[in-house]
Regions:
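HIT superfamily nucleotide-processing domains
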Residues: 1-131
């Protein structure tokens, strides 16, 4: 899809932009990172919904995610990670090409990191304070 920014990255295979590549996925640094080393892993084939990818494409994404995790760990020395997939507009997806966020986390990057990805719905996140 020529107007999809992620397809352009995957098609051009610009080695300067890519962190890693396998048979059906590529990884690159997020253009608008929320932390140092924030990366995206995407399928080469255009598909908006992660769950509509072929099983082998999903597997390749996860394999590449593991490879990128090791590279980011060696390069940036984060203390933790968040992994996230936004699906559809309601789920927060802003680019209609499936992608997995790999977000390195560092001590002190937020006041209280408990709950991690649960904060996508702030009112429900602090479950540890309920009885």
């Amino acid at each position: 899809m020529s107007d999809c920014p992620f397809c352009l990255i995957a098609e051009e295979s610009n080695e300067n932009e890519l962190i890693a590549v396998n048979r059906s996925a590529v990884a690159f640094f997020d253009k608008y990172p929320v932390s140092q080393g924030h990366a995206l892993v995407i399928p080469k084939r255009h598909e908006a919904n992660f769950f509509n990818l072929l099983p082998e494409e999903q597997l390749d994404l996860w394999k590449l995610l593991n490879e990128v995790h090791l590279a980011l760990s060696d390069t940036f020395l984060p203390e933790g990670f968040n992994v996230g997939i936004n699906i559809a507009e309601t789920g927060g997806q802003t680019v209609d090409h499936a992608h997995v966020h790999l977000i390195p986390r560092y001590g002190g990057d937020v006041e209280d990191p408990r709950g991690g990805v649960r904060w996508v719905i702030p009112d429900k996140a602090p479950y540890w304070g309920t009885k």
